[in-house]
Amino acid sequence: MEAADSATNNSKDTHFYGKSRAENRRRSDAMLLLFRALTFSFSLAAVVVMGTNRYRINPQLKVSWYDFEPYRYVLAVNAIICIYSFVETWLAVYTYLQGSYLLPEIFQVWFDYGHDQGFAYLLFSANSAGVAMAQLLQSGNTLIHGAYHCTEAGGYCTQARVSIALGFVAFLFLALSSLLTGLRVARWYLR
Protein backbone atom coordinates (compact mmCIF):
# COMPACT_ATOMS: atom_id res chain seq x y z
CA MET A 1 0.00 0.00 0.00
CA GLU A 2 2.80 2.41 0.87
CA ALA A 3 4.53 1.68 -2.44
CA ALA A 4 1.37 2.59 -4.33
CA ASP A 5 1.00 5.84 -2.36
CA SER A 6 4.61 6.85 -2.97
CA ALA A 7 4.27 6.05 -6.67
CA THR A 8 1.20 8.29 -6.81
CA ASN A 9 3.00 11.11 -5.00
CA ASN A 10 6.06 10.80 -7.24
CA SER A 11 3.96 10.96 -10.39
CA LYS A 12 2.59 14.39 -9.47
CA ASP A 13 4.17 17.24 -11.34
CA THR A 14 5.25 19.46 -8.45
CA HIS A 15 7.42 22.50 -8.41
CA PHE A 16 9.26 24.28 -5.64
CA TYR A 17 7.31 24.87 -2.44
CA GLY A 18 4.83 22.12 -3.33
CA LYS A 19 3.05 24.08 -6.08
CA SER A 20 2.24 22.44 -9.38
CA ARG A 21 3.38 24.01 -12.63
CA ALA A 22 -0.21 24.95 -13.43
CA GLU A 23 -0.62 26.72 -10.07
CA ASN A 24 2.65 28.60 -10.54
CA ARG A 25 1.72 29.60 -14.08
CA ARG A 26 -1.70 30.80 -12.96
CA ARG A 27 -0.12 32.85 -10.17
CA SER A 28 2.42 34.26 -12.64
CA ASP A 29 -0.42 35.13 -15.06
CA ALA A 30 -2.30 36.90 -12.25
CA MET A 31 0.77 38.91 -11.25
CA LEU A 32 1.44 39.86 -14.87
CA LEU A 33 -2.19 40.92 -15.28
CA LEU A 34 -1.91 43.09 -12.16
CA PHE A 35 1.35 44.71 -13.33
CA ARG A 36 -0.08 45.36 -16.81
CA ALA A 37 -3.24 46.94 -15.39
CA LEU A 38 -1.19 49.15 -13.04
CA THR A 39 1.10 50.20 -15.90
CA PHE A 40 -1.96 51.16 -17.93
CA SER A 41 -3.51 53.07 -15.02
CA PHE A 42 -0.43 55.10 -14.16
CA SER A 43 0.49 55.87 -17.77
CA LEU A 44 -3.10 56.97 -18.45
CA ALA A 45 -2.99 59.20 -15.36
CA ALA A 46 0.33 60.67 -16.54
CA VAL A 47 -1.17 61.44 -19.96
CA VAL A 48 -4.24 63.09 -18.44
CA VAL A 49 -2.24 65.17 -15.95
CA MET A 50 0.28 66.35 -18.56
CA GLY A 51 -2.38 66.86 -21.24
CA THR A 52 -4.39 69.16 -18.99
CA ASN A 53 -1.34 71.14 -17.86
CA ARG A 54 -2.22 74.69 -18.98
CA TYR A 55 -2.05 77.90 -16.95
CA ARG A 56 -2.53 81.59 -17.66
CA ILE A 57 0.39 83.75 -16.60
CA ASN A 58 -1.47 86.94 -17.47
CA PRO A 59 -4.58 87.73 -19.57
CA GLN A 60 -2.60 87.63 -22.83
CA LEU A 61 -0.16 84.81 -22.09
CA LYS A 62 -0.64 81.19 -21.17
CA VAL A 63 1.79 78.32 -20.73
CA SER A 64 1.04 74.76 -21.77
CA TRP A 65 2.73 71.37 -21.89
CA TYR A 66 3.44 71.71 -25.61
CA ASP A 67 5.59 74.82 -25.03
CA PHE A 68 8.51 72.59 -23.96
CA GLU A 69 9.80 69.70 -26.06
CA PRO A 70 10.67 67.41 -23.13
CA TYR A 71 7.08 67.65 -21.92
CA ARG A 72 5.82 66.77 -25.41
CA TYR A 73 8.14 63.76 -25.30
CA VAL A 74 6.79 62.75 -21.87
CA LEU A 75 3.19 63.00 -23.08
CA ALA A 76 3.83 61.14 -26.35
CA VAL A 77 5.72 58.26 -24.74
CA ASN A 78 3.19 57.90 -21.92
CA ALA A 79 0.42 57.78 -24.55
CA ILE A 80 2.29 55.04 -26.44
CA ILE A 81 2.80 53.10 -23.20
CA CYS A 82 -0.86 53.57 -22.33
CA ILE A 83 -1.97 52.03 -25.64
CA TYR A 84 0.60 49.23 -25.43
CA SER A 85 -0.27 48.36 -21.84
CA PHE A 86 -4.00 48.40 -22.66
CA VAL A 87 -3.46 45.81 -25.40
CA GLU A 88 -1.15 43.77 -23.17
CA THR A 89 -3.69 43.94 -20.32
CA TRP A 90 -6.32 42.55 -22.66
CA LEU A 91 -3.94 39.76 -23.69
CA ALA A 92 -3.14 39.06 -20.02
CA VAL A 93 -6.87 38.80 -19.22
CA TYR A 94 -7.29 36.37 -22.12
CA THR A 95 -4.30 34.30 -20.97
CA TYR A 96 -5.50 34.27 -17.36
CA LEU A 97 -9.07 33.24 -18.23
CA GLN A 98 -8.27 30.75 -21.00
CA GLY A 99 -5.06 29.33 -19.58
CA SER A 100 -3.40 29.58 -23.00
CA TYR A 101 -1.80 32.25 -25.16
CA LEU A 102 -3.69 33.98 -27.95
CA LEU A 103 -0.66 33.80 -30.25
CA PRO A 104 1.76 30.88 -30.62
CA GLU A 105 3.64 30.60 -27.33
CA ILE A 106 7.19 31.26 -28.56
CA PHE A 107 6.03 34.30 -30.53
CA GLN A 108 4.02 35.80 -27.67
CA VAL A 109 6.74 35.16 -25.08
CA TRP A 110 9.38 36.92 -27.17
CA PHE A 111 6.96 39.65 -28.32
CA ASP A 112 6.03 40.50 -24.73
CA TYR A 113 9.60 40.44 -23.47
CA GLY A 114 11.06 42.48 -26.34
CA HIS A 115 8.37 45.13 -26.23
CA ASP A 116 8.42 45.36 -22.44
CA GLN A 117 12.17 45.96 -22.54
CA GLY A 118 12.04 48.50 -25.37
CA PHE A 119 9.12 50.45 -23.99
CA ALA A 120 10.57 50.45 -20.47
CA TYR A 121 13.76 52.07 -21.77
CA LEU A 122 11.73 54.56 -23.81
CA LEU A 123 9.57 55.48 -20.81
CA PHE A 124 12.58 55.91 -18.56
CA SER A 125 14.23 58.13 -21.19
CA ALA A 126 11.16 60.34 -21.57
CA ASN A 127 10.66 60.76 -17.84
CA SER A 128 14.35 61.56 -17.38
CA ALA A 129 14.10 64.29 -20.02
CA GLY A 130 11.02 65.61 -18.24
CA VAL A 131 12.84 65.67 -14.89
CA ALA A 132 15.70 67.65 -16.44
CA MET A 133 13.26 70.22 -17.85
CA ALA A 134 11.38 70.45 -14.55
CA GLN A 135 14.65 71.08 -12.70
CA LEU A 136 15.68 73.79 -15.16
CA LEU A 137 12.33 75.53 -14.78
CA GLN A 138 12.31 75.20 -11.00
CA SER A 139 15.85 76.54 -10.61
CA GLY A 140 15.16 79.51 -12.88
CA ASN A 141 17.89 78.56 -15.38
CA THR A 142 15.16 78.26 -18.00
CA LEU A 143 12.29 80.73 -17.91
CA ILE A 144 8.76 80.24 -19.16
CA HIS A 145 8.43 82.27 -22.38
CA GLY A 146 11.84 83.73 -21.56
CA ALA A 147 10.61 85.91 -18.71
CA TYR A 148 8.55 84.04 -16.11
CA HIS A 149 9.50 81.77 -13.21
CA CYS A 150 7.54 78.73 -12.05
CA THR A 151 6.06 80.69 -9.18
CA GLU A 152 4.37 83.03 -11.66
CA ALA A 153 2.79 80.17 -13.61
CA GLY A 154 0.48 78.85 -10.91
CA GLY A 155 0.66 75.10 -10.56
CA TYR A 156 2.16 74.50 -14.00
CA CYS A 157 5.53 73.21 -12.78
CA THR A 158 3.98 71.15 -9.99
CA GLN A 159 1.52 69.50 -12.36
CA ALA A 160 4.34 68.66 -14.78
CA ARG A 161 6.32 67.05 -11.94
CA VAL A 162 3.26 65.04 -10.87
CA SER A 163 2.86 63.74 -14.43
CA ILE A 164 6.53 62.75 -14.54
CA ALA A 165 6.24 60.99 -11.17
CA LEU A 166 3.22 59.03 -12.44
CA GLY A 167 5.29 58.09 -15.50
CA PHE A 168 8.06 56.76 -13.26
CA VAL A 169 5.54 54.63 -11.35
CA ALA A 170 4.29 53.29 -14.70
CA PHE A 171 7.93 52.51 -15.53
CA LEU A 172 8.27 50.57 -12.27
CA PHE A 173 5.32 48.33 -13.10
CA LEU A 174 6.45 47.95 -16.71
CA ALA A 175 9.90 46.90 -15.46
CA LEU A 176 8.26 44.31 -13.17
CA SER A 177 6.25 43.05 -16.15
CA SER A 178 9.48 42.83 -18.10
CA LEU A 179 11.02 40.77 -15.32
CA LEU A 180 8.12 38.30 -15.41
CA THR A 181 8.17 38.03 -19.20
CA GLY A 182 11.94 37.52 -19.05
CA LEU A 183 11.33 34.61 -16.70
CA ARG A 184 8.83 33.21 -19.19
CA VAL A 185 11.45 33.35 -21.93
CA ALA A 186 13.92 31.53 -19.68
CA ARG A 187 11.33 28.90 -18.70
CA TRP A 188 10.43 28.32 -22.33
CA TYR A 189 14.04 27.49 -23.14
CA LEU A 190 14.61 25.42 -20.00
CA ARG A 191 11.82 22.94 -20.68
Curated annotation (Swiss-Prot):
Alphabetically ordered keywords of this record: Cell membrane, Membrane, Transmembrane, Transmembrane helix
Keyword Nuclease: no
Compartments where located: Cell membrane
Keyword Ribosomal protein attached: no
Topology in membrane: Multi-pass membrane protein
Annotated Gene Ontology cellular component terms: plasma membrane
Membrane spanning stretches: 30-50, 73-93, 117-137, 162-182
Pfam families: CASP_dom
Cytoplasmic side: 1-29, 94-116, 183-191
Topological domains annotated Extracellular: 51-72, 138-161
Highest taxon listed in the record's lineage: Eukaryota
Similarity annotation: Belongs to the Casparian strip membrane proteins (CASP) family.
Oligomeric and partner information: Homodimer and heterodimers.
Name under which the protein is recorded: CASP-like protein 4C2
Organism per entry: Physcomitrium patens
